[in-house]
Amino acid sequence: MSTSGTLTSYYVDSLILPESEELSVPRYPSGPGLQHARQSASISDHSELGTCTFPSKPPVFGPSWSHVPAQFPGTVSSVYHHHYGHPQGPVGADTDGRYQSWLLEPMSGSLPMAGLPTTHHYGIKPEGLGTRADGALPGSHTALLLSDYANGTVATASPVEKDTLSGQAGDVSGEAEEKPGLDPSKSLQNNPVSNWLHASATRKKRCPYTKHQILELEKEFLFNTYLTRDRRYEVARLLNLTERQVKIWFQNRRMKMKKFNKDGAPKDE
């Protein structure tokens, strides 16, 4: 009995003790030794696959940007502003440790930067209005100075120039008076707007038949008042006429005969 009792207590203790140990000790210890063992085991398990190598990629950005001078040459536009953000250089390039202020300062010059998309207007060099005045009024010497144009003042013409301009205007009016007056009827006929009032008829001019042609047609009409198509073709070929001309002549000749029969014989007879 004592032997069996000790065995039962041993088995009971062996069954109960692991549960109590599980409560006090964490189920998955995370010691460095265990992690190293797991890593070595995983490496040994997949050692037959080999290592993976990736090609090196080029850097996204190029080398560092060079220092941009604060003052640009005079060929750069003073009113150009790109619609994209301006890249800023490295902070260390400035001796004072502050950002460059040339991005916010206006640049000198009046020429546009070619090759860059923009919708801004550029400064245009104002033309001297003297060339336009010379083209409009030949012989005049009036011109606007660029300084006067910028200040908003206009130079007035001298009395001599006024006399010259008035003389030119008088010559132009005299030439207009010397021209002979146009006939109003001819001017209306030449005017394309009123041309339809005097338009000629669209019909072709009447081409009279020769005596020989009329004689032959009269002979044919005495024999046949109506012509067949074949006979009309033969008559037209013999008289050097078209079939339409022969047909129209026979129609007119029949109408004339009907009118003569309707009116009756002349009273003189």
UniProtKB/Swiss-Prot annotation:
Ranges of the DNA-binding region feature: 202-261
Superkingdom per UniProt: Eukaryota
Pfam entry (one): Homeodomain
Keyword Transmembrane: no
GO molecular function list: DNA-binding transcription factor activity, RNA polymerase II-specific; RNA polymerase II cis-regulatory region sequence-specific DNA binding
GO cellular component: nucleus
CDD domains: homeodomain (cd00086)
Alphabetical list of PROSITE patterns matching this protein: HOMEOBOX_1, HOMEOBOX_2
Keywords on record: Developmental protein, DNA-binding, Homeobox, Nucleus, Transcription, Transcription regulation
Alphabetical list of InterPro entries matching this protein: Abd-B_homeobox_TF (IPR050803), HD (IPR001356), HD_metazoa (IPR020479), Homeobox_CS (IPR017970), Homeodomain-like_sf (IPR009057), Hox9_activation_N (IPR006711), HXA9/HXB9/HXC9 (IPR017112)
GO biological process, one term: anterior/posterior pattern specification
Compartments, record wording: Nucleus
Region feature Disordered, mapped onto this chain: 159-192
Protein role: Sequence-specific transcription factor which is part of a developmental regulatory system that provides cells with specific positional identities on the anterior-posterior axis.
Record-stated family: Belongs to the Abd-B homeobox family.
Name the UniProt record assigns to this protein: Homeobox protein Hox-A9
Source organism per UniProt: Morone saxatilis
Gene label: hoxa9
